[in-house]
Amino acid sequence: MNTREEDIDYTPEAEPEEARKVYGEHIEKARKYFDLLVRDGDLLGLIGPRELPKLWSRHILNSAVVADLVDDGQLVADVGSGAGFPGVPMAILRPNVKFVLIEPMERRANWLAEVVVLELDLKNVKVLRGRAEEAPLRNYDVVTARAVSALPKLLRMLAPLTVQGGQVLAMKGSKAQDEIEESKPLMKKLKLESFEIVTVGQNILSDPTTVVRVRLL
Protein backbone atom coordinates (compact mmCIF):
# COMPACT_ATOMS: atom_id res chain seq x y z
CA MET A 1 0.00 0.00 0.00
CA ASN A 2 1.37 3.42 -0.96
CA THR A 3 1.91 5.94 1.80
CA ARG A 4 0.07 9.17 1.16
CA GLU A 5 2.14 12.35 1.33
CA GLU A 6 -0.02 13.73 4.13
CA ASP A 7 0.62 10.60 6.20
CA ILE A 8 4.40 11.02 6.22
CA ASP A 9 5.93 12.42 9.40
CA TYR A 10 8.37 15.21 8.56
CA THR A 11 9.14 16.10 12.17
CA PRO A 12 12.83 17.01 12.50
CA GLU A 13 14.87 14.37 14.30
CA ALA A 14 15.33 14.94 18.03
CA GLU A 15 18.95 15.41 19.00
CA PRO A 16 20.41 11.95 19.71
CA GLU A 17 22.78 11.42 22.61
CA GLU A 18 25.52 10.62 20.08
CA ALA A 19 25.54 14.27 19.00
CA ARG A 20 27.20 15.47 22.19
CA LYS A 21 29.62 12.53 22.11
CA VAL A 22 30.72 13.49 18.61
CA TYR A 23 30.81 17.27 19.02
CA GLY A 24 31.69 17.85 22.68
CA GLU A 25 32.49 21.53 23.20
CA HIS A 26 31.34 22.31 19.63
CA ILE A 27 27.79 21.04 20.13
CA GLU A 28 26.17 24.51 20.10
CA LYS A 29 27.41 25.24 16.59
CA ALA A 30 26.21 21.83 15.45
CA ARG A 31 22.78 22.59 16.91
CA LYS A 32 22.66 25.93 15.14
CA TYR A 33 23.56 24.28 11.84
CA PHE A 34 20.73 21.80 12.42
CA ASP A 35 18.35 24.70 13.06
CA LEU A 36 19.43 26.46 9.85
CA LEU A 37 18.82 23.29 7.84
CA VAL A 38 15.37 22.87 9.38
CA ARG A 39 14.54 26.51 8.67
CA ASP A 40 15.92 26.81 5.14
CA GLY A 41 16.49 23.29 3.84
CA ASP A 42 13.22 22.58 2.08
CA LEU A 43 12.45 26.22 1.28
CA LEU A 44 15.70 26.70 -0.64
CA GLY A 45 15.88 23.19 -2.07
CA LEU A 46 18.89 22.24 0.02
CA ILE A 47 17.39 19.05 1.45
CA GLY A 48 14.05 17.36 0.95
CA PRO A 49 11.46 17.26 3.76
CA ARG A 50 11.89 13.49 3.97
CA GLU A 51 15.43 14.06 5.26
CA LEU A 52 14.33 16.01 8.34
CA PRO A 53 13.49 12.93 10.47
CA LYS A 54 17.06 11.67 9.97
CA LEU A 55 18.91 14.98 9.78
CA TRP A 56 21.20 14.33 12.73
CA SER A 57 21.90 10.64 12.24
CA ARG A 58 22.15 10.28 8.46
CA HIS A 59 23.54 13.69 7.57
CA ILE A 60 25.21 15.75 10.31
CA LEU A 61 26.79 13.03 12.46
CA ASN A 62 27.36 10.73 9.49
CA SER A 63 29.44 13.52 7.94
CA ALA A 64 31.17 14.76 11.08
CA VAL A 65 32.95 11.48 11.85
CA VAL A 66 34.79 11.65 8.52
CA ALA A 67 36.92 14.32 10.21
CA ASP A 68 38.73 11.47 11.98
CA LEU A 69 40.59 10.89 8.69
CA VAL A 70 41.92 14.46 8.43
CA ASP A 71 44.94 15.97 10.22
CA ASP A 72 45.14 19.40 11.87
CA GLY A 73 46.53 22.08 9.57
CA GLN A 74 45.41 20.41 6.36
CA LEU A 75 43.44 22.10 3.58
CA VAL A 76 40.28 20.21 2.62
CA ALA A 77 38.06 20.74 -0.42
CA ASP A 78 34.47 19.52 -0.19
CA VAL A 79 33.25 19.11 -3.77
CA GLY A 80 29.56 19.37 -4.57
CA SER A 81 28.96 20.56 -1.03
CA GLY A 82 25.24 21.27 -1.50
CA ALA A 83 23.76 21.87 1.94
CA GLY A 84 27.26 21.52 3.39
CA PHE A 85 27.76 17.76 3.63
CA PRO A 86 30.24 16.57 4.68
CA GLY A 87 32.26 19.79 4.86
CA VAL A 88 30.29 21.86 7.38
CA PRO A 89 29.83 19.13 10.03
CA MET A 90 33.54 18.36 9.71
CA ALA A 91 34.54 22.03 9.92
CA ILE A 92 32.49 22.60 13.07
CA LEU A 93 34.26 19.70 14.73
CA ARG A 94 37.77 20.59 13.50
CA PRO A 95 38.46 24.35 13.73
CA ASN A 96 42.18 23.70 13.14
CA VAL A 97 41.49 22.36 9.64
CA LYS A 98 40.77 24.71 6.72
CA PHE A 99 37.86 23.87 4.42
CA VAL A 100 36.82 25.11 0.98
CA LEU A 101 33.23 24.26 0.08
CA ILE A 102 32.94 23.95 -3.71
CA GLU A 103 29.37 24.24 -4.98
CA PRO A 104 28.22 25.13 -8.53
CA MET A 105 24.64 26.18 -7.76
CA GLU A 106 24.39 29.88 -6.94
CA ARG A 107 21.54 29.52 -4.43
CA ARG A 108 23.33 26.86 -2.43
CA ALA A 109 26.72 28.57 -2.58
CA ASN A 110 25.19 31.84 -1.39
CA TRP A 111 23.43 30.09 1.48
CA LEU A 112 26.65 28.42 2.56
CA ALA A 113 28.63 31.66 2.39
CA GLU A 114 26.10 34.20 3.63
CA VAL A 115 24.16 32.13 6.15
CA VAL A 116 26.11 29.11 7.39
CA VAL A 117 29.65 30.49 7.46
CA LEU A 118 28.60 33.86 8.90
CA GLU A 119 25.97 32.74 11.41
CA LEU A 120 28.13 29.89 12.69
CA ASP A 121 31.25 32.09 12.64
CA LEU A 122 33.24 29.40 10.82
CA LYS A 123 36.56 31.18 10.37
CA ASN A 124 38.09 28.01 8.92
CA VAL A 125 35.65 27.80 6.00
CA LYS A 126 35.53 29.50 2.59
CA VAL A 127 33.00 28.94 -0.18
CA LEU A 128 33.93 28.67 -3.85
CA ARG A 129 31.07 28.84 -6.30
CA GLY A 130 31.95 26.67 -9.28
CA ARG A 131 32.46 23.18 -10.61
CA ALA A 132 35.26 20.88 -9.53
CA GLU A 133 36.90 21.38 -12.92
CA GLU A 134 37.21 25.11 -12.15
CA ALA A 135 38.95 24.67 -8.80
CA PRO A 136 42.74 25.06 -8.42
CA LEU A 137 44.70 21.96 -9.43
CA ARG A 138 47.02 20.11 -7.02
CA ASN A 139 45.94 22.47 -4.26
CA TYR A 140 44.25 20.41 -1.51
CA ASP A 141 45.63 17.91 0.99
CA VAL A 142 42.25 16.17 1.16
CA VAL A 143 39.25 16.24 -1.18
CA THR A 144 35.90 14.98 0.07
CA ALA A 145 32.63 14.17 -1.67
CA ARG A 146 29.29 12.69 -0.72
CA ALA A 147 26.59 11.35 -3.06
CA VAL A 148 28.07 13.09 -6.10
CA SER A 149 28.91 10.38 -8.66
CA ALA A 150 30.12 6.81 -9.04
CA LEU A 151 33.72 6.45 -7.88
CA PRO A 152 35.42 6.26 -11.32
CA LYS A 153 33.78 9.51 -12.45
CA LEU A 154 34.40 11.05 -9.05
CA LEU A 155 38.11 10.31 -9.15
CA ARG A 156 38.47 11.88 -12.59
CA MET A 157 37.12 15.09 -11.04
CA LEU A 158 38.79 14.98 -7.64
CA ALA A 159 42.24 13.44 -8.12
CA PRO A 160 43.54 16.42 -10.17
CA LEU A 161 42.69 18.75 -7.26
CA THR A 162 44.70 16.74 -4.73
CA VAL A 163 48.33 17.38 -3.86
CA GLN A 164 50.99 14.74 -4.32
CA GLY A 165 50.62 12.29 -1.43
CA GLY A 166 47.15 13.60 -0.59
CA GLN A 167 43.91 11.68 -0.32
CA VAL A 168 40.38 11.58 -1.68
CA LEU A 169 37.67 10.65 0.84
CA ALA A 170 34.47 9.48 -0.84
CA MET A 171 31.49 8.62 1.35
CA LYS A 172 30.00 5.44 -0.05
CA GLY A 173 27.58 2.65 0.78
CA SER A 174 27.41 -1.12 0.43
CA LYS A 175 28.75 -1.13 -3.15
CA ALA A 176 32.03 0.51 -2.20
CA GLN A 177 34.16 -2.51 -3.13
CA ASP A 178 32.48 -2.83 -6.53
CA GLU A 179 33.20 0.83 -7.24
CA ILE A 180 36.83 0.35 -6.23
CA GLU A 181 37.19 -2.51 -8.72
CA GLU A 182 35.70 -0.32 -11.44
CA SER A 183 38.19 2.42 -10.58
CA LYS A 184 41.40 0.36 -10.58
CA PRO A 185 42.05 0.81 -14.32
CA LEU A 186 42.46 4.54 -13.60
CA MET A 187 45.32 4.09 -11.10
CA LYS A 188 48.18 4.81 -13.50
CA LYS A 189 46.47 7.63 -15.39
CA LEU A 190 45.38 9.49 -12.24
CA LYS A 191 48.51 8.59 -10.23
CA LEU A 192 46.59 6.75 -7.53
CA GLU A 193 48.56 4.76 -4.98
CA SER A 194 45.94 2.75 -3.10
CA PHE A 195 42.28 2.21 -2.26
CA GLU A 196 40.98 1.45 1.22
CA ILE A 197 37.49 1.06 2.68
CA VAL A 198 37.42 2.73 6.09
CA THR A 199 34.61 2.64 8.64
CA VAL A 200 34.44 5.69 10.91
CA GLY A 201 32.26 6.43 13.90
CA GLN A 202 31.75 2.77 14.75
CA ASN A 203 32.41 3.38 18.45
CA ILE A 204 29.75 6.10 18.65
CA LEU A 205 27.19 5.83 15.85
CA SER A 206 24.69 2.99 15.51
CA ASP A 207 25.10 3.33 11.73
CA PRO A 208 28.79 4.09 11.08
CA THR A 209 30.03 5.85 7.96
CA THR A 210 31.74 4.02 5.11
CA VAL A 211 34.47 5.95 3.33
CA VAL A 212 36.58 4.97 0.36
CA ARG A 213 40.01 6.45 1.01
CA VAL A 214 42.11 6.87 -2.11
CA ARG A 215 45.74 7.85 -1.64
CA LEU A 216 47.65 9.60 -4.40
CA LEU A 217 51.27 9.10 -5.37
Task: Label each region the model flagged.
Residues E25, I47, R94-V97, R146:
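Residue-level signal for short amphipathic helical patches enriched in basic/charged
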Residues V79-S81:
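Conserved beta-strand/loop positions that form the S-adenosyl-L-methionine
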Residues M1-A77, R107-V125:
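Class I SAM-dependent transferase core
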Residues A83-N96:
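Conserved SAM-binding loop of SAM-dependent methyltransferases across substrates and taxa
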Residues L44-G45, P53-K54, A83, R146-S149:
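Flexible, active-site-adjacent loop/turn segments at secondary-structure boundaries
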Residues V66-D72, L93, E134-L137:
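Glycine-rich helix-loop-beta junction characteristic of Rossmann-like nucleotide cofactor-binding loops
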Residues G41-D42, F85, F195:
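Residue-level signal for pocket-adjacent positions within structured domains
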Residues N96-V100, P104-L217:
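S-adenosylmethionine
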